[in-house]
């Protein structure tokens, strides 16, 4: 991917530039690791604050956490089914929270004020490596869900309703993580690019409505990713007759 500089300090955006950490023979994207750990720290802090002093009549952060718990529980129950959803609620909830906080952090936190030797900080989900890793994690999870619940009977899925479907089902196993990863990556990166370009062209008020639209889109993308992950797991544990 090429190099795209936008000269204004508060609107600077560099696509394809990374801060690399060398660990053995591996090159890691340092800025993605930094922002990912910041996101994880923010989620952990939210949980600690919300559960430190539990009350029967919740308010504040505890009320927010209970709302999220109920919402994720309903989502998992609807997509996975009554029998198996409890086992997968923590996974679906963690996915949703990580993506949601990452997306909103990319829109609300002024990462570009923090200067790096190379590249710049931004939403972890605006990096293709993060979204591919999340999508592969979902793929491994629904394979595990199917095999752990059905054993070798899981592979009946590939011949249901007819063996003619085998090549299509195999192709589907590759397209699921691709669609998950590129949908999330494309939307979040496009949102950051649009806001940066508008700030460069009209730096005062025009970008504000676009930023609010970006927040809405970011929340929807987190919901779509979590819903599809739950749906794929539900599809894997579903009994075929």
UniProtKB/Swiss-Prot annotation:
Listed Pfam families: ATP-synt_A
UniProt GO cellular component terms: plasma membrane-derived thylakoid membrane; proton-transporting ATP synthase complex
PROSITE patterns: ATPASE_A
Keyword Nucleotide-binding tagged: no
Record-linked CDD domains: ATP-synt_Fo_a_6
Record's keyword terms, sorted: ATP synthesis, CF(0), Hydrogen ion transport, Ion transport, Membrane, Thylakoid, Transmembrane, Transmembrane helix, Transport
Recorded GO MF terms: proton-transporting ATP synthase activity, rotational mechanism
Signal peptide per UniProt: none
Cysteine pairs bridged by disulfides in the record: none
SUPFAM superfamilies noted in UniProt: F1F0 ATP synthase subunit A (SSF81336)
Coiled-coil stretches: none
InterPro entries, per database record: ATP_syn_F0_a_bact/chloroplast (IPR045082), ATP_synth_F0_asu (IPR000568), ATP_synth_F0_asu_AS (IPR023011), F0_ATP_A_sf (IPR035908)
Transmembrane parts of this sequence: 30-50, 91-111, 128-148, 193-213, 214-234
Gene3D superfamilies: ATP synthase, F0 complex, subunit A (1.20.120.220)
Record's bilayer topology term: Multi-pass membrane protein
Subcellular location: Cellular thylakoid membrane
Quaternary structure annotation from Swiss-Prot or TrEMBL: F-type ATPases have 2 components, CF(1) - the catalytic core - and CF(0) - the membrane proton channel. CF(1) has five subunits: alpha(3), beta(3), gamma(1), delta(1), epsilon(1). CF(0) has four main subunits: a, b, b' and c.
Described function: Key component of the proton channel; it plays a direct role in the translocation of protons across the membrane.
Recorded family membership: Belongs to the ATPase A chain family.
UniProt protein name: ATP synthase subunit a
Native source organism of the sequence: Prochlorococcus marinus (strain MIT 9313)
